[in-house]
Amino acid sequence: MAVPKQKRSRSRTHTKRAKIYRTVSVPISKCPNCGQPKLPHRVCLHCGYYNGKQILEIAE
């Protein structure tokens, strides 16, 4: 059965574990049609445009 050769120090363990809990920043771009912030490669929820085409009908 596999057994570790040496004990892992507390700082090494915490450093490795800290990467699990690190948050990932979400890239936010501006909609070229209305200028509102939106997620990339997704339809704008404010105007309904994606890639210069009307995809969703948004009631104002």
UniProtKB/Swiss-Prot annotation:
SS bond list: none
Keyword annotations: Ribonucleoprotein, Ribosomal protein
A GO CC term assigned to this protein in UniProt: large ribosomal subunit
Keyword Nucleus applies: no
Origin superkingdom: Bacteria
Pfam families associated with the record: Ribosomal_L32p
InterPro entries for the chain: Ribosomal_bL32, Ribosomal_bL32_bact, Ribosomal_zn-bd
GO MF terms held by the record: structural constituent of ribosome
Entry's Gene Ontology BP terms: translation
Family from the record: Belongs to the bacterial ribosomal protein bL32 family.
NCBIfam families attached to this UniProt entry: rpmF_bact
Protein name per the record: Large ribosomal subunit protein bL32
Species in which this protein is naturally found: Pseudothermotoga lettingae (strain ATCC BAA-301 / DSM 14385 / NBRC 107922 / TMO) (Thermotoga lettingae)
GN (gene name): rpmF
